[in-house]
């Protein structure tokens, strides 16, 4: 009977660890930022930078290598203006998404190797339209009627 119990505990610990890790969403924003501020940090980059250095700023908040990230090479004000286009349905079914009127320069960064503090990324430069989710601004956000809070899709 004892060997069966001994085999159970490591599995139980592994299950509990898995549940604990599942509670931390990869896209969770830092507590000190509004959703719009986190969007700007993660997805708005008016002047293109190499992915390895650009992702370092994002990864430092999370303390791990983010798998994939897209940077829009537009000023925040231009992305916020997209929030004034007609509403469309987001991937999650919510109706607060908006599509850009035109394609923009963007960079997609995909993790290829490394562990936190030494993350290596492959970059892909494209000109595409994008879809963002927008919400009313919170305290500390720029004063626009709606502000972008999530990059939903590149189209």
Curated annotation (Swiss-Prot):
Known EC number: 3.1.27.-
A Pfam family it matches: RnaseA
Site (Ancestral active site): residue numbering on this chain: 43
Gene Ontology cellular-component annotations: extracellular space
Protein name: Ribonuclease 8
PANTHER family reported in the protein's UniProt record: RIBONUCLEASE, RIBONUCLEASE 7
Encoding gene (name): RNASE8
Annotated source species: Saguinus oedipus (Cotton-top tamarin)
UniProt GO BP: defense response to fungus; defense response to Gram-negative bacterium; defense response to Gram-positive bacterium; innate immune response
Primary site of residence: secreted
Binding site for substrate: 66-70, 91
UniProt xrefs under Gene3D superfamilies: Ribonuclease A-like domain (3.10.130.10)
Subcellular location: Secreted
PROSITE patterns: RNASE_PANCREATIC (PS00127)
Family membership: Belongs to the pancreatic ribonuclease family.
